[in-house]
Amino acid sequence: LVYELNQTILNAKISKIAQPENDELMITIKNNRTVYRLLLSASASLPLIYLTDNNKPGPMTAPNFCMLLRKHIGSARILSVTQPGLERILIFELEHLNELGDICRKKLIVEIMGKHSNIIFCDLNGRIIDSIKHVSAQMSSVREVLPGRDYFIPDTMSKKNPMTATQEEFISAILAKPMPVSKAIYSSMTGISPVIAEEICYLAGVDSSMTAHDLSEDVLTHLYRQFTYYMEDVRQGNFHPSIYYNGNAPKEFSALPVTHFNEYTKKEFFSISEVLYTYYSTRNTLTRIHQKSADLRHVVQTALERNRKKYDLQSK
C-alpha cells in the first residue's frame, strides 16, 4: 500500500478533508489533473487505508478534529508516505503554509491496530497536536495519546524487522517460540501475516505444523533463504494484488503471490486499494445477506411453532 500511495499521491495537494464517521477521514487529493480519494479508517472492527472512487460526504457540521486538520493541512502537499519497518503504521509527512505564510511541516500518522487503531496529528518533532481518538492513562497503561504528549510507536521490540533480519536473528527468533513454525514466523516478524508465514513454509517445503526445534540446521537455513527471497519482492515492489475466492465468497487477499491456495480461485487486481475495497465490501454484503437470511429463518420458525401449537390445541 505504501508503494502504491507513493506512486499515486506523492507531491500531490490535499484539496478537501471530511470526517464521515467518528473514526474515519475522507481526504480528497489532486495530483496534476487526477483526483484521488483516500479513506483513512480507525474503526475498531475494520480499520483500513485505501484509495477509492467512492465519496463519503461528512456531516453538515464538521467534528473538531476535522476542523483542526482543515485549518492546518487543508491545502497541504504530501511530501512522503512511509512505514516504519513493516509496522501497521503509515506516516504522511505534509508541507503547508501557516497563518504568517511560513512553510511548516506536520505528520499525519495512521495506526492500523485493531481496537487500538488511531489517526494522530503531530508536529514535525513528534508532539501530538490532536488525534481522532483520545487515549488517557486510565484507558491505557502503555501509552497516552493526548494533545501535548510526545508520540512514540507502541513497543514491538519483541519482533524483528523482516527487511533487515539476519539469518541468526531469524533462526533465533523462531527457535525461541515453542509453537508451529509458521506461527513462530508471524509472531516474531513485524508485518508478516499468518497467510504469508504459511506460504514461506510451503515454498521452503517445510511442514508448518512442526516447531523450529523439530527442524535441522540445514532446513532452518533453507527456510531463512526462502524468507529473504519472499521479502525481496517487497523491496523491489513486485506486488501482485489478488483476492482468493471459494466460489463467490472472498476468503483471503494478498499483495504477494500465495501458491498454497490450490483450492481457491485467484483474481488479480490493478491495485491493493481496489483489492481492499472489493474484499471488504463483498464480505460485508455476504455478511448482511447471511444475517437477513438468519433473521428470516427465525421469523419462519417462530411462525411455524406458533401455528403448530394452535393446531395441537384445536386437535384436542
Labelled PLM ranges:
Residues L1-K316:
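Extended, highly charged segments
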